[in-house]
């Protein structure tokens, strides 16, 4: 009962951290620590999300698993380019555009006129590769949902691929890419309009 009532900084005591919105949590970065040495979660942020439509990948592959992996690889590179566009759009932003966020401590304590660039690297912020349609992708590719042994195997392989790509990009660019279960409330409509 007491645990369910804890909020904010009290939650840190029990290694439970509130999310940044619906489903995005800051990653645990060794480079981000408070002055007392504990991991820093509060004041960090997410640069944005780009979502891969796994159902479209499966439908485009027409049930052929080799083709599925080729298309997935291609779409992941497209997502990576889009994520880089989001990141690069933020580069050069000066703290003056949102003083409460960047100067007065909501996210940082930068000087007037200072850019937020250093906050976009080295784990201070994350940028997310979202995914949508994992269950439906499994049904299209295996005829079974992600809760069946066949579907679960494919779902885990795909999730591992997404994680591996984020790790690869992070190591190459020093930008903290993360995997994010995209809320489908508005994304479904956007995907439907594109098909």
Predicted features and spans:
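Single conserved hydrophobic/aromatic residue that forms the stacking wall/gate
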Residues: 1-8, 13
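Function-dense linear segments that define catalytic or interfacial modules
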Residues: 14-116
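Secondary-structure capping and boundary motifs in well-ordered enzyme cores
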Residues: 44, 102-107, 118-130, 151-158
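Inter-helical turn/loop segments and adjacent helix faces that build the functional surface
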Residues: 58-72, 140-152, 169
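Short glycine/threonine-rich loop-to-helix capping motif typified by GTGT followed
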Residues: 105-108, 145-147, 186-195
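Contiguous, well-ordered alpha-helical segments that form the cores/surfaces of helical PPI scaffolds
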Residues: 127-140, 160
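Catalytic phosphate/nucleotide-handling subdomain of diverse soluble enzymes
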Residues: 151-169, 174
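Extended amphipathic alpha-helical segments with heptad-repeat/coiled-coil character used for oligomerization
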Residues: 170-195
